[in-house]
């Protein structure tokens, strides 16, 4: 069957449904295509966090604008999204992470975010069920919170359909073809759909679909795992993260403690099954943090896939005159979805990119990264470092936990252990330097997992990155913010 629309949206997650909602409010003829069911991808499998904190600098203003919408969304959408704005604490378990977290707080404050450092006593006063002996402190953003992802996405979806949006579920897009008439033809197994504008909000299917239509983008699917316990008495209202890993946890409105995400795996296939080893690690980790939680029964577990980019920010840009991509939200797109949907609708209706989306253009990956980025290997090299950041340290001092032997047996060959000098006023924390090194030196990094120190001279802050002390200075070439210090010879300062 053939269909015609003003705008086709591919993807029934938070970005796709929010965009459909805002477009129909303006009277646009919208057709939404979803290969499974609404919220069946990353949105419905997410942790439910609604946060501005712990983001790269360019994304903070977007997150702040989006979080400002949440208090009124239940009324606007006509459904209780179970939004709780009680703050987000990013817990610090060891001294290794105290100073880095404090420096990162200062970075976020410089972008207008209300975030502060709490010492152990303050954290425990705010959240008594936490285990005192395992908490050094935390970053705290009181305006952050959490919600029910299913209620949020179905709220936007229902409002969009009430506004006139048409929907084809269980409808997988196979290809998108441009025509001389200015229309795009979207091909599915059962339908052919035409529209001048196609918005791809396709989540974990984005990289493969973009590749089929001629665009090889640095999007790699990462698999997250989640669990939820039986309903428990009230423990806390806040959303929690952990500085040393991607573990999150929150207590839902029905009392279950939803946690997971601490184990990240690159997903070469679309497999959302959970693994016993990962589940045991996550359970052990949260049990060290929360009193008596190890006694709670688990009700269910699930996995999810979400595309990530090298710099931790989404790609929101036109691929050609017909196709607008919004993908690569790196596991934290639920909070920004409502505002991204509004801005995407504004973009296609007014034919001008909103200033708020300027940082997310695909051109930032031109050059070396666009040709060298592959999901296999590069992500594994970066993610594999997560488990070694504390494990290799036998020190309790600040700022020296990441010392490792140089790659070369003769320590004088490269002057011993090297330290890269970073300008803290310019660095945004995007980790492009780390990713560049892991890509360019993929085999050596995956074998050795060696590190150097990145030093913020003004703050005595040591940030670990993956490196094998190469002469090519891939990290310097990858830095988009002129944050890396150079010496009089133009080499990276050490």
Over which residues does each language-model region extend?
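Central helical "cap/lid" subdomain
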Residues: 192-236
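Active-site lid/adjacent beta-loop-alpha segment flanking the redox-cofactor pocket in flavoenzymes
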Residues: 231-325
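C-terminal catalytic lobe of FAD-dependent flavoproteins
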Residues: 149, 288-383
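Glycine-rich FAD pyrophosphate-binding loop
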Residues: 24-43
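Helix-loop-beta segment of a Rossmann-like dinucleotide-binding subdomain
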Residues: 81-90, 104, 117-120, 124-163, ...
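Iron-sulfur cluster-binding cysteine motifs and their immediate structural context
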Residues: 399, 405-408, 432-453, 472-494
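Helical element adjacent to the flavin cofactor pocket in flavoenzyme catalytic cores
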Residues: 139-194
